[in-house]
Amino acid sequence: MSEFQKIIKYFAIALAMFLIFSIISGISFGLSLVGNIFNGNDSEVLEDVLELVEIEDNINVLDISVTSSNILIKVGDTFKIDTDNKYIDYKQDGKKFKVTEKKHNLFNSNNSKLIIYIPSDMTLDDVEIDSGAGKIDVDKLSVRNLNLNLGAGSVNIDNLMVFNSASIDGGAGETVIKNSDINNLELDMGVGRFSITATILGNSDIDHGVGEAIINLLGDAMEYQINVSKGLGSVSVDGKNINNNSIIGNGMNKIDLDCGVGSVVVNFLR
């Protein structure tokens, strides 16, 4: 892809995100208004009332798909779920636990919560999270394979351990990942501010979209090789500006970094 094509690509991404967000906002407002007229107060969330459900500990797959609820993953003594949103539906199918939000109200002003408690010593096989306009807060998560599809809300993830592979599709909000160890990361940062502080092992692909990105790599610089390509954006590694089609380092952990529109700052935290 030529530099001009990359410029067009990233401007198109930014414009598309803006148009999609505007259209969804208008549709959601209209549907919410109609729903309130016909349903009265039925759309209200049961505030301050958490429904606690304990789940069998043999879960190894977690699938979450919500549109407006805030997602919180916390450490607990057993695997369980809390929610104050009556439109949250959940079911266990063997070793898979699936959570969905039945009502599509992307701009729910009630700030409903979906809280998942996971024992600190539990490592799940697969976790998939598909979020809408709500926030995501993760205190600790250990998983072999991770798939995150982020929406418009802010994301704060701490103590993330991914042993096999991780796919993260960034949205339009601010995303912060810290104190983490990730193998074979495929990251599309989306639009907005993205910050990650982690040991990134194996072969990884980081695609920076529009905005500011800070990548703090844990470990020595000799452990990494970074292949840089860029369009309009700027890339700096350990304080040095990097040209297009540059290769930094010769380590075992390889990162293909594609910078779009904005800036990418890479630091090594030894």
Regions found by a protein language model. Give the residues of each.
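Short linear S-[DN]-x-LW-Φ motif typified by the pepsin-like aspartic protease active-site region
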Residues: F29-D130, K135-N147, N156, I215-G219, ...
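Short, surface-exposed interaction patches in beta-rich subdomains
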Residues: I157-L160, N164-G170, E174-R270
